Amino acid sequence: MEEAERFPRLVSLACHDLRTPLATIYGFARTLTRSGDYDERTMRFLGMIEAAAEQMTEQLDDLGVAARIKGGRFDPLIREADTLDLARSEDARVETVGSGERVETDAEAVQGALSALAIAAIRHGPVERVTWTVDGRSLTLAPVTDAAAPVVLGEQIRDLGAVVARLVVEALDGSVALDGGSLRVVL
């Protein structure tokens, strides 16, 4: 195995091996929470453990995707999706407007990438809300402050989701670029 392949394989292996103990932590916290036999404080702590385990699972997923892309083993699941739907987020701080276009892409990976870019813009802005403006294959995220721009672009390695988001978009032949106070993604 060449050196360039070794590190991405190591990261993939670590992600895989960490899932079992993490699933155990999540499973026990969830089981205890469902029993409801605890005081309010303990239930709150169990909920925090559950939420942290879910977040860590998402981060392991991101690391696995990055390792597959960097290792040349990314195998996207291509299907037709509307760009407006891809930009929609469950997070109330992210608004989506405009008109989409049907594209062939890895919808789940792209939707996760767009969500991660929006959350990074909010977190590192810091700003209260952001908006995706969709115009066909072109999606514009605003505002992206000067403080958030290098993080959202993945140039400053301070947000795993943003770094992986850019890798995903570019692996699917898209682009991510700063355009004044906004981020432009072309799918």
Region roles according to the model:
Residues 12, 27, 58-72:
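Conserved E/DxxT/N motif and adjacent residues on the DHp alpha2 helix
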Residues 138-162:
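Glycine-rich/acidic phosphate-handling loop/turn and adjacent ATP-lid/helix
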